[in-house]
């Protein structure tokens, strides 16, 4: 591998590493979406919520004298209560989430995220082994694993987006306002870096095609 191509590979691997870190942050945190109800009475309290792939957290916030009828922002101080989703931890209760959205959505998003982490692990193993002499070919399966991981993150993001939409549209929930949090942004950035980084790594790791017919003859091994 030439020095120019090796430099491109290192830069691409660094971008993929950033994508891996962002994917891990998105999976383990619970700020994918922030939900708030409509505030009818001023100088009272309202209950906002934020959730991720594994748990939901609600916060009771004091509402001040404001023309804004929404609850929040979520960063305001208040009584906080977090619980893991019932289908992941039977010992915990999360009735709000269980009632207001479909269990299949959260299970699907979490399962696909786990598949993404699995592809990341396989890609990292191949990438580390490729640093040994004459094992540059392992960069190709590593690139595919990273691209697949990015696609899984994208699917998980889309499933979570549909889950939030169903929660807002449901008549059984008090949530009427929502916005996506920083965990969601980390997941979107991870998708871009992993998918595009995987494609770029595949292109950079491919052997150079001969421009002229005689170049392939010159590169051929001599017969004994």
UniProtKB/Swiss-Prot annotation:
Q: Which GO terms describe its molecular function?
A: calcium channel regulator activity; voltage-gated calcium channel activity
Q: Any idea where this protein resides?
A: Cell membrane, Sarcolemma
- Summarize the PTM comment: N-glycosylated.
The disulfides recorded in the entry are: 57-82
Segments crossing the lipid bilayer: 11-29, 111-131, 137-157, 182-206
Where, if anywhere, are coiled coils annotated?
Answer: none
- Function recorded in the entry: Regulatory subunit of the voltage-gated calcium channel that gives rise to L-type calcium currents in skeletal muscle. Regulates channel inactivation kinetics.
Q: What is this protein called?
A: Voltage-dependent calcium channel gamma-1 subunit
